[in-house]
């Protein structure tokens, strides 16, 4: 710059006030790279988020213990006037639809069979029916029950899930609209207790099972969930120290029609750790979109 401007310090910013120098990638920064952008150590040695303890094998290599976030492409969004696909139509389909036909039935199971825990914010279950059983609202969707033997259930002092009635508007978080329950964990048989979610299945078929729970500083890392599907039982250990305030996927199972003790989810307070077990809503099936924008839903 010509004099006298070469004596000035010039800062370039975008409309949001962000310094444009921050947009320079580390690859072009030479020795003055930004350490805050580095992954550093990402290996996790703690208990997995979800462990199927009924599976007949435990991978000793592969992706065992790894946690992956995976999106099955894009989806529908509200453009200010209507809901539409994010990607353009091409050869009678869109990326939003076509890619998930590869990711959901093939890629996700492959990663899970190799030992990984896969979290996908986009719904993975194509079951259009949905049943939610929650401690806050007793409806025809199912029944929530608690049993106590020495230890007692109580309300959490942190928010929990409550089913939306019937839709969600902008800014609403269903995981902060209700309450959750808690109980002390124990290894003593005399103090064992349980919570049971028994759904009223609208049509026999395969349904994904999701559980939710509240965050507490002393949550245990091995909450014991039992999924009873057509009388068979599959046992899980869920690390409640992570993943609270969302739907935690356990698996997809065959369920019979109607409400039956042969189709339910059970959570016990049995644990090898001291702390609390928290219980909230349980969802069966993927369902349909219920987000309101304008005068229509997703």
Residue ranges and their predicted role:
Residues 54-151, 293-298:
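Active-site histidine-acidic residue metal-binding/catalytic motifs
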Residues 230-259:
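Extracellular carbohydrate recognition and processing domains
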Residues 215-234:
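Short, surface-exposed beta-strand/strand-loop-strand elements in extracellular ectodomains
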Residues 178-201:
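Short beta-strands within extracellular/lumenal beta-sheet-rich domains
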Residues 250, 282-284:
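Extracellular beta-strand elements of beta-rich domains used
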Residues 265-276:
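Short beta-strand-plus-loop segments that form exposed binding edges in beta-rich domains
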Residues 193-217:
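A short beta-strand element within beta-rich, extracytoplasmic domains
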Residues 1-74, 79-86, 285-297:
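Non-catalytic propeptide/linker segments at domain boundaries
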């Amino acid at each position: 710059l010509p004099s006298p401007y070469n004596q000035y310090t010039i800062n370039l910013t975008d409309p949001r006030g962000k310094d444009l120098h921050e947009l320079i990638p580390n690859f072009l920064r030479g020795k003055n790279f930004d350490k805050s952008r580095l992954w550093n150590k990402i290996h996790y040695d703690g208990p997995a988020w979800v462990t199927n303890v009924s599976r007949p094998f435990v991978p000793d290599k592969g992706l065992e213990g790894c946690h992956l976030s995976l999106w099955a492409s894009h989806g529908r969004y509200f453009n200010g006037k209507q809901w539409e696909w994010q990607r353009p139509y091409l050869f009678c389909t869109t990326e939003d639809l076509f890619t998930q036909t590869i990711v959901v039935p093939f890629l996700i199971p492959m990663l899970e069979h190799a030992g990984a825990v896969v979290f996908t914010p986009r719904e993975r279950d194509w079951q259009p029916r949905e049943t939610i059983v929650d401690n806050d609202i007793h409806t025809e969707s199912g029944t929530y029950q608690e049993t106590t033997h020495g230890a007692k259930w109580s309300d959490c002092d942190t928010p929990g899930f409550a089913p939306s009635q019937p839709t969600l508007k902008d800014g609403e978080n269903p995981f902060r609209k209700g309450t959750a329950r808690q109980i002390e964990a124990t290894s003593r048989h005399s103090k064992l207790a349980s919570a049971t979610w028994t759904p009223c299945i609208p049509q026999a078929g395969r349904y994904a099972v999701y559980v939710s729970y509240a965050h507490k500083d002393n949550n245990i890392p091995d909450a014991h969930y039992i999924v009873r599907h057509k009388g068979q039982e599959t046992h899980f250990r869920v690390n409640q120290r992570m993943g609270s305030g969302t739907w935690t996927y356990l698996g997809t199972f065959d369920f019979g029609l109607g409400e039956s003790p042969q189709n339910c989810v059970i959570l016990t307070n049995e644990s090898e750790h001291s702390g609390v077990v928290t219980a909230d809503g349980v969802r069966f099936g993927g369902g349909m979109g219920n987000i309101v924008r304008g005068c229509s839903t997703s």
